[in-house]
């Protein structure tokens, strides 16, 4: 949070000094630099508290596992980034208002799933600890708690979106988007947050269960499915709602596969 706040302050100063888009890049780079230094310092402090062990480590096997998991995560991130970029760039073929609205909606959507993404990251650690104790995740107390918390968050985000989406958008663009924000768009954005909560939770669960291959595959498959649906529907309905239909299809596919691969 501190690094983000510092980056925001630097960003404003760079814009004031006339750096423009360069200020954004500078602020982002500074934020990542500060975050990396901070995390490195904290990690070293934590490592000092861990007792040393004489346990023999199979370094070649560990190295192979590291690069294997890293490769799967890289492939997953690549397809997910490309799909989200497609949703942004496809809006650029619409009106200026729709371009701006799509950008705002995706930013709000990103803020929405931060809550469950935090749970997903925590679940990965908790599940790994559970598995290391030779206990099963399926039908465990941990599984029930994760699902119940995620369900509560997903309902909350969906309801808030339906009721106040136009108000959130007005915070950034006044009332010039009223023509484009109808009930259908509100429901689609709300549904994406509802389904997305489970999709991101299953990501953390699969990584905790050491199923990086499935974790990567379901994101690749869901991104491709969302892209195909968008491409097909946009031929006859070139609207923002169509883009969100594609995103919902992708998230639904991802959440269903994520649930299946847990078993």
Language model segments and positions:
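Small-residue-rich hydrophobic transmembrane alpha-helices
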Residues: 102-163, 197-210, 214-215
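Short membrane-interface helical motifs at transmembrane helix boundaries
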Residues: 156-178
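Small-residue-rich transmembrane alpha-helices that serve as helix-helix interface/gating elements
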Residues: 24-36, 221-224, 240-258
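Interhelical loop/hinge segments that connect adjacent transmembrane helices in multipass membrane
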Residues: 25-28, 39-81, 263
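Alpha-helical transmembrane segments of multi-pass membrane proteins
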Residues: 1, 108-110, 176-202, 228
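Interfacial/gating helices of multi-pass transporter permease domains
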Residues: 21-22, 26, 61-69, 91-110, ...
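Single conserved hydrophobic/aromatic residue that forms the stacking wall/gate
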Residues: 1-11
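Helix-terminus/linker motif at the lipid-water interface of multi-pass membrane proteins
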Residues: 15-19, 78-111, 129-130, 169-175
